[in-house]
Amino acid sequence: MTDKVNMAEIIERLEQLEAHNAIRNCLNRYMEICDELNANTDLDELMNLFDQDCIWEGIGEKYAKSFGRYDSWQSIYDMFKSYTQNESHFVMNAHFVNSEQIYVNQNDANASWLMLQTSTFKDGRSHLNTAKLNVKFQKQADGTWKIKHFQTQNIFSRPVSHWHSEAELPLPSQE
């Protein structure tokens, strides 16, 4: 018995896998850069993750009020620039994303993640946030995938006392 190989179908499946991987890498690089926002951050690298015709917005009651909406590449750049002053807004910032869903349709894609963000600010306060991310991506002429429309919606947000403790880790007895 001989199986007929449909090369067009195999190529389409391979392109889907490559698109998923590129989209995932784009969002993860975005988070890595946001974890280290300070006066030395290369905003050009961050903004290279965005399509030239892009939108970044907070949605829902809390994040629409806190973040607002930025309707151009330059306005998004300026928003991130405000986080990169000499005295950084964040002393510690770590983003964790999970529950990923990516749907690719040829040259565009819709994706979503749950995001957990742990932060300590320059004033010493610490915060725990969880948000739903809905992100549209656009395939570029060179084949790369970039953020077209980034939306973040708060699920919960709360202050915490601190993140790091010198207390010993509780471990099971080795006896």
Named regions from a protein language model:
Residues 43-110:
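A solvent-exposed, acidic/Ser-Thr-rich amphipathic alpha-helical stretch
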Residues 18, 41, 68-71, 125:
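A structural signal for alpha-helical segments
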Residues 2-11, 88-175:
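A beta-strand edge to alpha-helix "cap/lid" segment located at domain peripheries
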Residues 34, 50-51, 58, 115-117, ...:
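Short beta-strand segments enriched in hydrophobic/aromatic residues
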Residues 1-36, 40-49:
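Short, low-complexity N-terminal intrinsically disordered segments enriched in polar/charged residues
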